[in-house]
Amino acid sequence: MTSTTPFRYQGADGVPLAAFRWATSDPPRAILQLAHGAGEHAGRYREPLAPVLAAGFAVYAADHRGHGLTSGMSHLGDFGPGGAPACVADMAELSKLARAENPGLPLVLIGHSMGAMFAQAYLLEHSGLIDALVLSGTTGPGPRLPGGPNSIFPNPRTAYDWLSRDEAEVDKYIADPLCGIQFSEASMASFVALRSRELSVEALAGVKRGLPVYVFVGDEDPINRRLEGLEPLIAAYRGAGLSVTLKAYPGGRHEMLNETNREDVVRDLLAWLEAHT
């Protein structure tokens, strides 16, 4: 049975953040720290990660600034004056907390979508805090699809068909009042600026060499432009000495943990985690 422990912790600048600890065993075999995506919240991941929890991993998951229980309904989409860099710093503070509460256990950072891109920025300054990195629904820097993410799918049923082929999961996202939020202009600008150096040779020079990295995506994900956007990311990480495994699922869209083949996706993720912790 999964235990849920809600808590709050302070970011580096003192801002309180809402978070959860999920676990099925005490002590756990390893720690998984989750960074959720844009326009959603950490609570969406408890069910998809249930097999990982059952295998003995504990999960620490926080709602970013401008999201979920951290912001409340009145401030959704606004990172605040610290912008996107503050969100990355918050992740490092949560890593330190998870390590302090679980001394000696491996710590794996998993980020999805915006959370994966935050993780890519985190990597440049804080790779020493983690033992492995998992990126879901991510991409390297590059242009967005001019028609928006739904534009590659003919006759979409909803504005969010690009998330998953599973209509029930798309409908759950649409019905969730904490999902589908729009960013403030300042928050979006800070996010774009954050990504400007993530693949430079100089920026990657200080990253822990040999760090295991697992990237799993759908090959119909418009965020990575059907895998095109991943090529520079994978090349840069391998060039920096990281041990990268790429798993691309045929037909998969953006949220592979909520896709029609999610059982296979989670099984593959768990196998990789068990091999690297």
Residue ranges of predicted features:
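Conserved alpha/beta-hydrolase
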Residues: 42-44, 49-75
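Short beta-strand/loop motif that positions the catalytic acidic residue
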Residues: 215-217
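Alpha/beta-hydrolase active-site loop
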Residues: 80-100
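N-terminal cap/lid segment of alpha/beta-hydrolase-fold proteins
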Residues: 1-24
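Active-site glycine-rich loops that stabilize anionic/oxyanionic intermediates
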Residues: 36-40, 113, 219-220
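Catalytic active-site module of serine/aspartate enzymes centered on a nucleophile-bearing elbow/loop
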Residues: 240-277
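Alpha/beta-hydrolase-fold enzymes
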Residues: 110-183
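Short beta-strand element of the alpha/beta-hydrolase
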Residues: 28-37
